[in-house]
């Protein structure tokens, strides 16, 4: 099943992080996302370019609405013509399948609004 068609599952502190094999399976479905480590926590991160601040804010709101609907929330940095989105699972201080699902959903929103 395509990641954009999946739903986030409730995540508890004892939930397993995605392993190397699962990352190898999931990451090709969101190739524009980088896996970065910040303060010892792996995250999915992508910078989106938009035409101006108004479009950046609108994109931020759309991502926020999807995050609320799924109960899984990113870090968002909105600037003129740019939005940086970071997904990771706070409860496990690492990456969970939910992060890959939400990255794919973020890509779908970006495609709808013309963000690159």
Swiss-Prot record:
Tell me which InterPro entries the record gives.
PCD_sf, Pterin-4-alpha-carb_dehyd, Pterin_deHydtase
Which reaction equation describes what this protein catalyses? (4aS,6R)-4a-hydroxy-L-erythro-5,6,7,8-tetrahydrobiopterin = (6R)-L-erythro-6,7-dihydrobiopterin + H2O
Q: Does the keyword NAD apply?
A: no
Q: Which SUPFAM superfamilies match?
A: PCD-like
Q: Would I find Glycoprotein among this entry's keywords?
A: no
EC annotation? 4.2.1.96
* One Gene Ontology term from the biological process aspect of the record: tetrahydrobiopterin biosynthetic process
Any single GO molecular-function term of the entry would be:
4-alpha-hydroxytetrahydrobiopterin dehydratase activity
User: What NCBIfam families does the annotation carry?
Assistant: PRK00823.1-1 (NF002016)
Per its record, how is this protein called by name?
A: Putative pterin-4-alpha-carbinolamine dehydratase 1
């Amino acid at each position: 099943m395509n990641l954009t068609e999946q739903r986030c599952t409730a995540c508890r502190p004892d939930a397993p992080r995605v392993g190397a094999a699962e990352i190898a399976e999931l990451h090709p479905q969101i190739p524009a996302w980088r896996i970065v480590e910040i303060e010892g926590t792996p995250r999915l991160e992508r910078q989106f370019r938009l035409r101006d601040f108004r479009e950046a804010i609108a994109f931020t709101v759309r991502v926020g609405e999807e995050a609320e609907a799924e109960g899984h929330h990113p870090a968002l940095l909105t600037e003129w013509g740019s939005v940086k989105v970071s997904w990771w699972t706070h409860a496990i201080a690492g990456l969970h399948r939910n992060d890959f699902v939400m990255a794919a959903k973020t890509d779908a929103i970006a495609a709808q609004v013309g963000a690159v």
